[in-house]
Design a protein with these regions (language model features):
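Short loop/turn microsegments at loop-to-beta-strand junctions
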Residues: 47-48, 70, 168-170
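Structural microenvironment flanking redox-active thiols in thiol-disulfide oxidoreductases
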Residues: 85-144
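Thiol/disulfide oxidoreductase modules built on the thioredoxin-like
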Residues: 140-196
Length: 203
């Protein structure tokens, strides 16, 4: 579960690259801001090219999803609460959008490749058939996470060798050309997420 210190680090990082909450939008964006009060509009460099492996070992690159909106989520399969809740919200939003959801590619990037790689395919398939789970070496994952300004760190558990991962559980939204559109905070409801996605699908 994301800790308060983690959220503070995330917000500081995003602020430093020019992320702004839509509090006082220009007049022509007022309607959008009212609909998307959970969405942070990006002005800095967040995201970028990546190549990781899917559960079959096939290399997948962000460039193959051009023409679709891309939802990017960093998490891990052992996450007890935040990840399942956010992935379920995404799943419900995709279901609500119906056929239009074909123009959205949801991607789950594990921040725990040591434990997740073997179970990643089954895990994401339990939420929505269009989800693609991606993994890689710890170094590859760290590089992509850094590009998205996503924080994560191992937290020792009770038993020997046990651990959880403290991570930023936000939902990143990327445009049809791969540009960063913004992110939704943890536990954004499916209704709000549907509204946001529907607006961008119409563009």
């Amino acid at each position: 579960m994301i800790a308060s210190r983690t959220l503070a680090l995330l917000l500081m990082s995003l602020f430093n690259v020019g992320i702004a909450i839509a509090e006082d939008p220009p007049p022509d964006q007022i309607a959008a801001a009212q609909m998307m009060d959970d969405l942070m509009h990006g002005r800095g460099t967040v995201g970028g090219p990546f190549t990781l492996a899917d559960p079959t070992g096939r290399k997948r690159s962000d460039s193959e999803f051009r023409g679709k909106l891309m939802i990017v989520y960093f998490g891990y399969t052992f996450c007890p609460d935040v990840c399942p809740a956010d992935l379920m919200a995404i799943t419900q939003a995709l279901a609500e959008l119906g056929p239009a959801a074909r123009d959205i590619q949801p991607i789950f990037i594990t921040v725990d490749p040591e434990r997740d790689t073997k179970v990643l395919g089954e895990y994401v398939a339990a939420f929505h058939k269009s989800f693609i789970g991606l993994t890689g070496t710890p170094e590859e994952i760290r590089k992509v996470a850094n590009a998205y300004k996503a924080f994560y760190a191992k937290v020792p558990g009770v038993g020997k060798g046990e651990y959880e991962i403290d991570h930023t559980g936000v939902i990143y939204l990327m445009g049809r050309d791969g540009e960063y559109l913004g992110f939704m905070p943890p536990q954004t409801g499916p209704e709000r997420l549907t509204e946001i996605l529907r607006q961008y699908l119409a563009k």
